């Protein structure tokens, strides 16, 4: 356990940031799963709507460094490819 006051504060901040990042990553995974389910059903309208929502969440996470920009680009690219196959 840390003895220095600033180290104790950093531990608390890290716990908060970790929880926040886990929540954001979980939300991204949920949107991607919903998008994939819409793709399986061949529902282009729903898939497009979910693609836009997922893209927004992924970009927000990338801008806050929750996930890397390359990881975000890869996720969006894969989803766009699946959406274009549906057309």
UniProtKB/Swiss-Prot annotation:
| UniProt record similarity statement | Belongs to the bacterial ribosomal protein bS20 family.
Identify the GO cellular component terms for this protein: cytosol; small ribosomal subunit
Q: Name one GO molecular function term.
A: small ribosomal subunit rRNA binding
**What NCBIfam families does the entry give?**
S20
Q: What biological function has been recorded for the protein in this entry?
A: Binds directly to 16S ribosomal RNA.
SUPFAM superfamilies, per this entry? Ribosomal protein S20 (SSF46992)
- Origin species, per record, is Finegoldia magna (strain ATCC 29328 / DSM 20472 / WAL 2508)
Per its UniProt entry, which superkingdom is the organism in?
Answer: Bacteria
A GO biological process held by the record: translation
Q: Which Gene3D superfamilies match?
A: Ribosomal protein S20 (1.20.58.110)
Q: Which InterPro entries match?
A: Ribosomal_bS20, Ribosomal_bS20_sf
What protein name applies here?
Answer: Small ribosomal subunit protein bS20
């Amino acid at each position: 356990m840390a003895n220095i006051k600033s180290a104790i504060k950093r531990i608390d901040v890290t716990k908060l940031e970790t929880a926040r990042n886990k929540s954001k990553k979980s939300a991204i995974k949920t949107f991607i799963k919903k998008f994939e389910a819409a793709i399986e059903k061949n529902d282009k309208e729903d898939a497009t709507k979910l693609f836009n929502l997922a893209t927004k969440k992924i970009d927000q996470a990338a801008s806050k460094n929750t996930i890397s920009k390359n990881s975000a680009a890869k996720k969006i690219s894969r989803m766009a490819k699946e959406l274009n196959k549906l057309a």
